[in-house]
């Protein structure tokens, strides 16, 4: 997986490379962080729904796994393009501290909604792999800002039933684990979730946490949509250019449209 930072999502659609992008807008308490906005090609008036591509690794992480900021990686750029083509603004950003800066970004969207042309009442989140624990903080009952919906792709969720898979992976790979000690009971019940799973995931923590989360989430009757790519490896949307992978990416875009676009 040495090329994981440059690979693009396996689904290609006409017009992806032509979406409008506003780059390196300042946000954060000291205005020292940057965000990119990918806009739908439709030139209509008014505000758009939006999706935040959540970053769960500290921007100060050393050693740096790549010279690219997460907002410039192949997965992020291509996913933002696909989201924009779906009629939703996609937001990619830089950070220093994952949880605090994600909350700062939410606040910025609410405070600057009009000039950004974003409807702050229709914001979702999407996160993959080790970025998922940070995204989970937004759907906790004590979260200051909550998304309308959330997509968690092949990622670590919560350590439940005494497990330590997520905590161990966070120590190994360096991602934030703000959900340590939390349970499914801490989650809101009104945020629809799409959870995707790679049946052949090479990283045991991912499916171990997903499987426990799904079991307990169903007991608690959470609004979960679950998709399992039985033969998919980790990051199958990058490494498995198959019909199944492309269908799941399309399902992801459909899920976001259904929950964020008022006209659908």
Where in this protein do the model-derived segments appear?
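N-terminal cap/lid segment of alpha/beta-hydrolase-fold proteins
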Residues: 1-46
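Short, flexible/disordered intra-domain loops and linkers
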Residues: 62-74, 204-205, 241-244
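The feature captures the conserved acid-bearing segment of alpha/beta-hydrolase catalytic domains
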Residues: 149-150, 155-219
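C-terminal catalytic histidine-bearing segment of alpha/beta-hydrolase fold enzymes
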Residues: 211, 218-264
